[in-house]
């Protein structure tokens, strides 16, 4: 039997998603909890591996098991062995054709950026921060150059294991709400550090360091050294993973963050 789980986690508490020998990752915590509840080792496959500091609101995993448990028992039973920084939100039996990674056709990330002369300790690990004003319109104009199917080598980390740098970026939204700017990135898939590298470039344009059309030149150059430095992970959230309707994957529970109303206005895809 194949079981899918919806997972939320505070990325600041972990050294990324992927299991490591030191055991301080989200996958390590989840698989330990599943093993405690199921009394047998269980291996999970994830929709998308996130880096240290990146949060998960709509992460999806699957695993195979012979155990017959109710959906909610997987939720409550696993959560009983998890730390407070990670939680199973839902569980659902799936056909063997479902695969958390390869069945997904799109991913959505949000970035929350606090724009204020003084940093807030209340937002540590929850939002990025910049002390200088940003030009929203300039960032929107720059983002427009990135929409479509392109070779995103200029925004790819040297450690990226993707077979191809070509991805289809469907949408970048920029929305201001008080001292916060909310960015939404939606694509069929993302390269390692791609969103954070895009953020670094958009912020550089927003600060007036480069014109909006500079980003078109960076994209065309296919060279990581042409782009701005990788932006901080603090405000980055994996918010949604899209699957074919036949799998009826439950939606991500975004109401657990204080700025969910702003994200709702951006019309998160179902």
UniProtKB/Swiss-Prot annotation:
The active site is at residue 51. One of its GO terms (molecular function) is RNA binding. Substrate binds at residue 109. Transmembrane segments: none annotated. Gene3D superfamilies: Pseudouridine synthase I, catalytic domain, C-terminal subdomain, Pseudouridine synthase I, catalytic domain, N-terminal subdomain. It catalyses: uridine(38/39/40) in tRNA = pseudouridine(38/39/40) in tRNA. Its EC number is 5.4.99.12. One of its GO terms (biological process) is tRNA pseudouridine synthesis. It is an enzyme of class 5 (isomerase). The keyword Ligase does not apply. Keywords: Isomerase, tRNA processing. Pfam families: PseudoU_synth_1. It comes from the Bacteria. Belongs to the tRNA pseudouridine synthase TruA family. Formation of pseudouridine at positions 38, 39 and 40 in the anticodon stem and loop of transfer RNAs. Homodimer. This is tRNA pseudouridine synthase A. It comes from Burkholderia ambifaria (strain MC40-6).
